[in-house]
Design a protein with these regions (language model features):
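Alpha-helical transmembrane segments and adjacent TM-loop junctions that form the membrane-embedded core
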Residues: 2-39, 55-57, 61-67, 71-351
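The first (N-terminal) embedded transmembrane alpha-helix
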Residues: 38-50
Length: 351
């Protein structure tokens, strides 16, 4: 008996696996929300302290750095909203859930980093022609160190958790915090340069840091845009294929497709089995493949497994179907031609 699972025979998540996958997704989203809350608080305090210092030092560079810190804190809000949305159940309209909101938040973060780099370069170029005078150099330097430590702490925290839960957007937000930490360093070096009698040190360091920010934008955007276009790391499909191919009853893995949806991965796998198997036996093999995939791939939250008989794998089966001989095809075409010549016996809707 030929076995091919489609709607009724697709391997679905068993109750145990379903609860496990959902629990893992909720936990990951909860961790993401916690990170955004903590980083928002840390960067908010950092920015407020710097703003107070700006008030009595008049440091333009420190003011720019303070604005960057407020901006970085603000980018935590759409990411927070995205993690919250990802916990909602799928609907008829959004039947894959709301994970893509996280990728869109990542895009906003990349654009924010780019804006920071452009602003830093603009300010540095302006200061080349008119180096600013800075009062209370030691206070400005301490504020810059405080800003750097606050931003770098948040950056390390965001990137660590982002890698653990598979969130490109959270990693990008970590890079955003690091960028603001670099602008704090620019303020520090500028203050030291003025103290040493080299006022041009401030804008020169600012330009160097602007170039570093541009590089961060390029590297971060690769990951974010890749996920928006359903890209995945090249080794992931190979891992899926390897796990599926060593499962008992699988003779071949015909096709593998994997994509990210927020911080979770979805997979579609076509496996080839003995055509003499019953529908139930083919379904059991598919369930086992599903089980192995969920337990062996860290970020995978669901996998759809299709079963094809040997000789007609994947799209080949859909083109020809089981027992779809040339005679049957001619019969179908002849029947279709005859039906065109028959009068329409349908009900009339005319009044």
């Amino acid at each position: 008996m030929h076995v091919h699972s489609q709607s009724e025979d697709e391997a679905r998540v068993s109750h145990g696996h379903a609860h496990g996958a959902v629990d893992a997704e909720i936990l990951a989203s909860s961790r993401g929300i916690r990170v955004t809350k903590i980083s928002l608080a840390v960067l908010g305090v950092t920015a407020v302290v710097q703003l107070v210092i700006v008030g009595f030092t008049g440091s333009v560079a420190l003011l720019a750095d303070t604005i960057h810190n407020f901006g970085d804190a603000a980018t935590a809000l759409p990411l927070w909203a995205a993690f919250t949305l990802s916990r909602k159940l799928p609907t008829k309209r959004f039947n894959y859930g709301y994970g893509r909101a996280e990728d869109l938040a990542g895009l906003l973060i990349v654009l924010s980093i780019l804006a920071t780099g452009i602003f830093a370069a603009y300010e540095s170029i302006n200061r080349l022609g008119d180096p600013p005078e800075i009062d209370y150099l030691w206070v400005v330097a301490l504020a810059a160190v405080f800003g750097f430590l606050g931003n770098e702490t948040v950056a390390l925290y965001r990137m660590k958790v982002g890698k653990e839960i598979g969130s490109a957007a959270l990693i990008a937000d970590g890079h955003h915090a690091r960028v603001d930490g670099l602008t704090s360093l620019a303020v520090l070096f500028g203050a030291v340069g003025v103290w040493l009698g080299y006022p041009l040190a401030d804008p020169i360091v600012g330009l160097v840091i602007s170039a570093a920010i541009l590089r961060i934008v390029i590297e971060t955007s690769k990951s974010v845009f890749s996920r928006l276009l359903d890209g995945v790391e090249p080794e992931v499909p190979d891992e899926v294929r390897e796990v599926a191919s060593v499962t008992d009853g699988v003779q071949e893995v015909a096709e593998v497709r994997v994509r990210w949806l927020g911080h979770k991965m979805l997979a579609e796998v076509n496996i080839v089995v003995d055509p003499g198997l019953s529908v139930g036996a083919g379904h059991d093999i598919a369930e086992n493949v599903h089980h192995q995939l969920l337990h062996n791939l860290k970020y995978l939250s669901n996998a759809t497994v299709h079963v094809d008989p040997v000789g007609l794998a994947g799209e080949e089966f859909h083109r020809h179907g089981p027992g779809n001989t040339e005679h049957q095809q001619e019969h179908v075409e002849e029947h279709a031609h005859d039906s065109e010549d028959e009068p329409d016996h349908g009900h009339s809707h005319d009044n």
